[in-house]
């Protein structure tokens, strides 16, 4: 997690937006659970994982679109063959992923990332809470 936020900070210092994908809910059999994160940079490279395979590919595409459009979104993925919205995985579950566009020009974003890194450096228990009610909340 620390490396992910360090890389996010580097992107922001270069003036580049990025997308942070976070699994916020999972049900049934899924490769990763809630709290798993992946950073996708403007050039399409990624750090972290939200499960690999088809779900990670779809999340990466959604992240690249978020960086391009500068908008966050909430996406649901079905990992069960034959169900509506099936993406071709056979795990048997469902995941909900919050794709959060991180704008380098957002007031206070650098300070927030610095706070996250300082908490991670001392290994304190903490929560990073996202407001999902407004797509451009962060």
Q: Model features per residue range: what roles?
A:
Residues 1-138:
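Segments forming oxygen-rich coordination pockets for charged ligands
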